[in-house]
Amino acid sequence: MKRFFTIVLSLVLLAAISRPLSGQDLVIVHTNDFHSQIEPFQSGRNAGTAGLLSLSGYLEESRMVCPDLLYLDAGDYNQGTPYFNLFGGQVEVEGMNALGLFATTLGNHEFDNGMEDLVRRLKKADYHVLCANYDIQHKPLRRLVKPYVITRVNGKKIGIIGLTLDLNGLVSSEVLRKMNYRDVILTANRMASLLKRKGCDLIICLTHQGLDSDMEMAAQSRNINLIIGGHSHTFLEEPVKKADLDGQEVVIVQAGAYGVYAGRIDITF
């Protein structure tokens, strides 16, 4: 069946002043792999850009035009600067709360301080934490993580699925014992079919698995419209487009790392 909507994508350099968004039926701002970059870089080729603080100003201005804007993050907002070492990820959670993050998926670095520490942090999160392809045995974490979320924007139902790569070799054995991996493609298709039956007009996969895996998943998928990815730190100046099993176009985006850029997606139904 033909899909009746238009997706327009671009990237925004997160300097001190960035051009705010114009209004559309649905506006999504997306980031990935912040790695505890709270402040802009002070030197180097990205001096004056990046960080949660730069994104804060951009989102504030953009929401004046698009109050229903969805901000999504594709994981690994922890680990990489002294902020994480000194404060154990709490600054990042509070920062994402302040930014009005709607949903994120679990990146491998979210587990760097262990399962109990992650639970402690996520209890303070105001946003949805999504991961559909893990059978989480640790009950405190299982209560905080959901496979998908559905929201309604301007009369349209938007379904968002969280997916995470195989964590074997990336996290501690203590974490692995409590996280049973499920095939990401099978899970994505199962969840997308469920969301389609629930009447979603747009189905998004929020993934932390890298661009190559996103492209493979898109080609073997059904009902997925958009993949917002992370993990490989890929700067996609233009979106990647893949045909799914039904010949429908799946759009894949990723915005580099550290918040130097934010992705912007305008959707008209």
Indicate residue ranges for each PLM-predicted region:
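Bacterial N-terminal signal peptides
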Residues: 7-16
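Positively charged n-region of N-terminal signal peptides that target proteins for export
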Residues: 1-4
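Acidic, metal/ion-coordinating pockets
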Residues: 21-269
